Amino acid sequence: MAASLFRALLLALALSVSVWAAGCRSVAPERFGELNPRLGELLLVGFHGTTLQDNAALDRLLCETRVAGVILFARNIVDAAQTARLTRGLTARARACTGRPLLVAVDAEGGRVMRLGPAAGWTATLSHQDLGQAGDLAETELEARRIGGMLRDAGINWNLAPVIDVGYNPANPVIVGVGRSFGANPKLVAAQARAYIAGMHAAGILTAVKHFPGHGSSVDDSHAGFVDVTDTARPDVELVPYRLLLAEGVVDAVMTAHVYNRHLDAWVPATLSRPTIDGVLRSQLGWRGVVVSDDMRMGAIEQHYGAGDAAVQALRAGVDLILIADDRLPGDRSASAETLTAIRRAVRRGRLPAGQVEEALARIAALRSRLTVAADVR
């Protein structure tokens, strides 16, 4: 217990020091004035409610915060017709307020991680584990295309899948234990993911491979708290799917993991780590597209860092898009509002370089420009 607390204090101290030391040169007022209205585009946010009507908090997200996108969960979904009405309203309202398309994201991996499931009237789907064990790439592409069609018809345009964590640790509770890995062979994982992405693209759905640099080795769950993979990680195995898929140009976005590996960064978990994101993912593997964080409300982050400081550190590390799965905080507070305040302060004071923010916004804009699901859902 004492060791865990000491480690948490060290990590929190490292975050505070690194954010403070990032640079003290304030951005020019004119440049900040140009950036400020767009800083909400660095956010992908989950909300409460199943309709836009009488939902002031949701309207603020779309028209005041001006988020790049929203993410749907079971709490937002009743059935297919309601979901289509909701997404149609979301996309229309966002475009009316901002003139830009809205990312409408969901976790629809298949199997147990499937927000559009039988309970809401959709048919059952196969998990990554099911598909990997079957070993039929044509079946994987067909199943992904079927899931993608479900998303398209519901007005969803971004699936935060596939999982390309290599499942070589049978004791892993959050990936292997719930059927979220295609398998223990990294080349098989890459092949299955390639087919899965092809199916999604055929349905007009964007994807995100996850969880970089690998969550398949852990013995803990980053949803619940701090996860240290220093002694279990195998980068020679876990980075293979990324290396192969990124080189082929089939990846739309990469999602990070909140895992700590002192061999990559002795101070902070991957999402907050510049050596991991900017160093390994961007410099070594050559990724130039969008990097989206995993949920910043997860225990691995929220239990150790303030939401705003963590978001600033993630952006400094090379993350482009900050995922906040639940915007509602105790006391009628907004996680996205507090995060945006911290980002604005960091940009204004020069702690988050304006040039880096502009690059992130450009990558996000390029991703949004590829959306193919129209506001009028078929």
Describe the predicted segments one by one.
Residues 347-377:
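Mid-to-C-terminal alpha-helical segments outside catalytic/metal-binding sites
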Residues 8-20:
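Bacterial N-terminal signal peptides
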Residues 41-46, 68-73, 102-106, 112, ...:
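Structural recognition of the beta-strand scaffold that forms the well-ordered cores
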Residues 53-54, 78-95, 188-352:
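Second-shell residues forming the walls of enzyme active-site clefts
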Residues 91-123, 140-167, 189-213:
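Glycine-rich, aromatic-flanked loop segments that form ligand/cofactor-binding clefts
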Residues 121-135, 179-183:
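A charged helix-plus-loop insertion that forms the helical arch/lid used to bind
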Residues 158-183, 203-207, 211-227:
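Short glycine/serine-rich loop/turn segments
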